[in-house]
């Protein structure tokens, strides 16, 4: 009898230790920085703010989430924001095989994180290629998306080359963009993170309606690790399969807000209009006097739209 009681006590202790070693839901979403390993990738994420959960989806080609964490901080007064670095970028680790740097891989990463965080469904905000990841997620996992905010987003398999070229041509005689266009049209094959960072800084004026005022404000938010040239080359590999999004937008069930700067050349208004036509429960807002980063150039209008939608 004593042996049985002792065995039961030992088992109880072991179970208690095992349970204590697994983060509980409230710990996983406690304010602060966290790491978790899922499917062979160690993800960094940060939780900040108060209110309903809003997951911030960063791009997946080598930049981290720092520019969003700093730039979108005013939303923390209204929402609990979860920021995370995508696989291979910033503080998250590389996948074992560089072939697994596709948008589809990142969509599945987000689903693993949703389950890990214990969220029944999410409101997602994706910027730029982060918007393409959010689109892919809402297509593949429509039941788990409560609301979708797409900010200057692209579509993974949409050919926007003509739209982009038209936007560049409209700026070619503007001295504010002369050096950026020259860099954009030159040979580009960075070998180091430093070279990649230098290139991005040279072309960055093109991403603003008014670079003279926009660039210094953006620089204050872009304080994270250097962009990863490894992630860029792995993501941009010519044989990398594209996720089929363009013909599947009608699978998205969530209410969707689409925001785009009228002066955005990389994710132009024409592409945003294409997204609106494909998602039945969507609304498009074109923001005047803004390029690719509307929270920098038209912050009051941008935050008002997001708060009104996501609340």
Placement of each model-derived feature along the sequence:
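Acidic catalytic loop of the alpha/beta-hydrolase fold
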Residues: 263-267
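Short beta-strand/loop motif that positions the catalytic acidic residue
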Residues: 252, 258-260
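Conserved HGGG/HGGXW glycine-rich cap/lid loop of the alpha/beta-hydrolase fold
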Residues: 38-94, 99
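Active-site loop/oxyanion-hole signature of alpha/beta-hydrolase fold enzymes
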Residues: 86-129
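Flexible "cap/lid" loop of the alpha/beta hydrolase fold
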Residues: 148-186
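Alpha/beta-hydrolase
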Residues: 176-247, 254
């Amino acid at each position: 009898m004593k042996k049985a009681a002792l065995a039961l006590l030992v088992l109880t202790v072991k179970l208690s230790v095992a349970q204590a070693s697994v983060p509980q839901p409230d710990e996983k979403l406690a304010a602060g920085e966290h790491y978790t390993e899922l499917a062979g990738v160690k993800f960094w994420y940060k939780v900040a703010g108060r209110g309903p959960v809003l997951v911030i989806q960063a791009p997946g080609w080598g930049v981290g989430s720092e520019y969003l964490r700093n730039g979108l901080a005013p939303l923390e007064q209204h929402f609990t924001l979860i920021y995370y670095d995508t696989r291979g970028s910033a503080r998250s680790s590389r996948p074992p095989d560089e072939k697994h740097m596709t948008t589809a891989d990142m969509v599945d990463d987000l689903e693993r994180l949703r389950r890990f965080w214990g969220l029944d469904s999410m409101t997602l905000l994706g910027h730029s290629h982060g918007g393409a990841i959010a689109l892919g997620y809402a297509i593949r996992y429509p039941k788990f998306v409560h609301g979708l905010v797409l900010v200057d987003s692209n579509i993974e398999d949409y050919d926007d080359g003509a739209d982009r070229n038209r936007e560049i041509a409209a700026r070619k005689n503007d001295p504010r963009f002369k050096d950026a266009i020259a860099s954009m049209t030159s040979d580009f094959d960075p070998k180091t993170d430093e070279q990649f960072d230098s290139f991005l800084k040279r072309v960055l004026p093109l991403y603003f309606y008014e670079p003279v005022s926009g660039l210094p404000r953006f620089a204050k938010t872009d304080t994270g690790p250097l962009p990863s040239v490894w992630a860029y080359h792995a993501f941009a590999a010519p044989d990398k399969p594209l996720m089929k999004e363009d013909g599947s937008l009608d699978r998205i069930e969530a209410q969707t807000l689409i925001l785009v700067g009228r002066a955005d050349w990389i994710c132009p208004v024409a592409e945003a209009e294409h997204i609106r036509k494909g998602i039945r429960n969507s609304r498009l807002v074109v923001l005047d006097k803004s390029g690719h980063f509307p929270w920098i150039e038209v912050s009051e209008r941008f935050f008002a739209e997001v708060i009104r939608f996501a609340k």
